[in-house]
Curated annotation (Swiss-Prot):
GO terms for molecular function: serine-type endopeptidase inhibitor activity. Residues 1-23 form the signal peptide. It comes from Schistocerca gregaria (Desert locust). Belongs to the protease inhibitor I19 family. It holds the Pfam family Pacifastin_I. In vitro, active against alpha-chymotrypsin. Disulfide bonds join 24-39, 34-52, 37-47. The keyword Secreted applies. The record marks 49-50 as: Reactive bond. This is Serine protease inhibitor 3. Expressed in hemolymph, ovaries, testes and fat body of adults but are absent in the gut. Also present in larval hemolymph and fat body.
Length: 63
């Protein structure tokens, strides 16, 4: 039982660290060449869903 709890805690901590690494600064905006993205008050990207024709270049990368 103790090992199961330890594994659960490790997974929980890993998930929280990953979530924080992907968070953005609330109010910040980015343009990917077609759509605008705004960072919500909760730290998540919200983007317009305008159709974007295929292009040779990449787009905005959230990493």
């Amino acid at each position: 039982m103790a090992k199961l709890l330890a594994v659960f805690l490790v997974l929980l901590i890993a998930a929280l660290v990953c979530e924080q690494a992907l968070a953005c600064t609330p109010g910040s905006r980015k343009y990917d060449g077609c759509n605008w993205c705004t960072c919500s008050s909760g730290g998540a990207w919200i983007c317009t869903l305008k159709y974007c024709p295929p292009s040779s270049g990449g787009g905005l990368t959230f990493a």
